[in-house]
Amino acid sequence: MAFPQELAIVIQKEMEKLDLKQVKIISDNITNKYRNESGKNRSLINKEIEALVYSAVRMPATYEAVSSVLDQTKKLYSKECKSLLDVGAGTGAATWAACNYFNIEKIVCLEKEAAMEKIGRKYMREGHRAIQQAE
């Protein structure tokens, strides 16, 4: 399923405020952190600007990966999902994807990185009612 237009627009607006060289440096740093520090119980995204860059660089691919899984799940699982618990929600890619596949009424997002949670909540204000009301 295609990346939501309203989400792409809000990410683009946020990214327009940033310097392209700075985005490249931050993107490279994020990639290195994920390659070298994942699974070591370290904070990988500490600053809001890192969460913004993460959302522009990685969120669309995460959204597509989750969408692919949900597409297969929906084919195999006939029941309608009404609630979602998104553990490690990041900036909300899985939440957005799930809401495009199921009629989600209640969402709880858990994210340990404050910067990721802040950006995710900002983006969720652009979503439909259940996304806007996510806890």
Where are these regions (language model features)?
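Class I SAM-dependent methyltransferase Rossmann-like catalytic core
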Residues: 42, 47-66
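Conserved alpha-helix/loop element of class I SAM-dependent methyltransferases that forms part
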Residues: 60-80
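Conserved SAM-binding loop
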Residues: 120-121
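Conserved SAM-binding strand-loop segment of SAM-dependent methyltransferases
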Residues: 128-135
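Conserved SAM/SAH-binding beta-strand->alpha-helix loop
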Residues: 113
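Conserved SAM-binding loop of SAM-dependent methyltransferases across substrates and taxa
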Residues: 91-104
